[in-house]
Amino acid sequence: MQLATIFLGFIVFGFSENIKGPAIPRIQFDFMLNESQLGTLLSLNALGYLIACSFTAFLTRLWGIKIVSIAAFGVMILSGVFIYLSNSFPMFSSSYFLMYIGNGMLEIALAILGARIFVKNTGTMMNLTHGFYGLSSTVAPLIATGLMSVSVFGHMLDWRGMYVAMLSLSILPILFALRSSFPSDEVAHEDRVPMKTLMRDRVLWFMVLILSFGVVSELAVGGWLVNFLEKAYKWEGVKASGMLSAFFLCFTLARLILGPITDKIGFILSLIIFSGFSALCTFGAIIGGEPLAFLFAAAGIGIAMIYPTVMAFIAKRYPNGTDTAITFTVTLMGVGSVIGNYLIGGVIELVKNGVGSDTQIGLIRGLQTGYGFIGLCAAICAVFSFILYLILKKQKELI
């Protein structure tokens, strides 16, 4: 039951994160948003995610992991209803913000639960469970595209109906969680590593930087790839969503198959190799143009490994402070997500206006530059991983 809750939790998490790709162009059209406003919207929602990350570990110690997990799924169902009812941009923004509160709570809860359960073969099991996120992410864009064109009793679902339908799937892990018994926190209060001690460890700060740049590069694909392909290359929505699904297929297969490699060659070396590969694929796709667009999908192989590998590293390095270390790292990662999404939208708008705001070439150059920033984040992730590798090798603390 514990594993079923984790696996279903990551499936729902993947749906909620990645149905936005096909929906964003429609949302943008309905509310008449430019790229800068769209970036701001995604940043504000990342802020909701950040806020949730900051209090979820505290609630876990107060209420227990079971209640917090159920509450996270409940918030996501509620947000779906509010998104469906939203008829103005402020109401939609608030509803979307609430969904990211649920996402943040769920991410911390699943990470803590995984760290408590998977004490052996940590890298393999973390990647396996996160692989279920990839599975749902693979089909999410195609399902979202299909649902938006479905009519129920003569009424088109559109993006509002699609959101409420997909987020209602959260009821499934709730049912499993209600019947499950979850491991309690067995670390005594006096044995727990204090936050101040963790904050003095520069290795944890490197993890924050690596995770922040890696996750911005990962999550930005779900928000911007379909938009990029539809506007820059004039792809149809189904074809563009298919490329996003191909990205997540590569993403999923990498997590399901390559997890044991991280345990074998080491977590930090894995971070260097995989983030570097993702950066090369992204830059290659942009420079090569439409004929090399398949490299956008191939980039998923590399970026998929960053988050679970960082979680595995934290679980191994801080066995008596895993909850605190995860919360600290993921919360600051949320700050990076807010800034990253805002910068992507801002860069696109800035370059587009500089080249020609009303021209096709201006839009293409803006989107290329914005997507180039996504590749740059993966490259920076690789650089920080390499620096950390040198530090830990010198201290003989490589994991």
Where are these regions (language model features)?
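Helix-breaking motifs and short loop linkers at transmembrane-helix boundaries and internal kinks
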Residues: M32, G64, L85-P90, V119, ...
